[in-house]
Amino acid sequence: NKKWYDSTDVIASISKVTYDIVNNVSPNTENHYVPHAVQDDVFKKLPKDDVAGFRADNMGENGKDKMIFFWNNRNARRKQSGTLALWFSEFAEEVGPENVCLIMHTDPKDVHGQDLEAILHDHDYDDGRILISREKVPPTHLSMMYNMADVTVNISDAEGFGLGTLESLSCGTPI
């Protein structure tokens, strides 16, 4: 890639490996290490008792034994929110909708997305298998939501680096 590195004014390397490669292959090219990051004092594995209390406060007795899936994205077409609702509902029918819950943390009526409330209502997905979390919350609350989830779901088309993926993994929640 030397010819490409040499033809570039500035390279922003998102990993130390890339930074070292560029520096070795093309030492005269301006190269900056700019890692993706989240607040590691906020997005981290939290104490189980705190998470259990948060889950009880937010999911109630009904959510105690459910497997929780978490989706935290803008409700934009490329994030495929409506498709996710369909796929999750099909999965819920296979395992029993009383056993699983998808929490979609998003604006359900984003002008660049789909009307999630209408989709849930029109397809009878509004029975508790899919919940919408629409309020803007501080990062500490969001971290608790990642910790409460058993798994984070992240599908999209033409994605950037995936901030939600990094936040979730930082909290110890698999994607």
Where are these regions (language model features)?
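Short alpha-helical donor nucleotide-sugar binding micro-motif in glycosyltransferases
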Residues: 5, 144-149
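Carbohydrate-associated surface elements
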Residues: 17, 37
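Acidic anion/phosphate-binding donor-loop and adjacent secondary structure
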Residues: 38-57
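Nucleotide-activated donor-binding/catalytic signature segment of Leloir-type glycosyltransferases, i.e.
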Residues: 113-140
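Aromatic "clamp/platform" in nucleotide-sugar-dependent glycosyltransferases that forms part
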Residues: 157
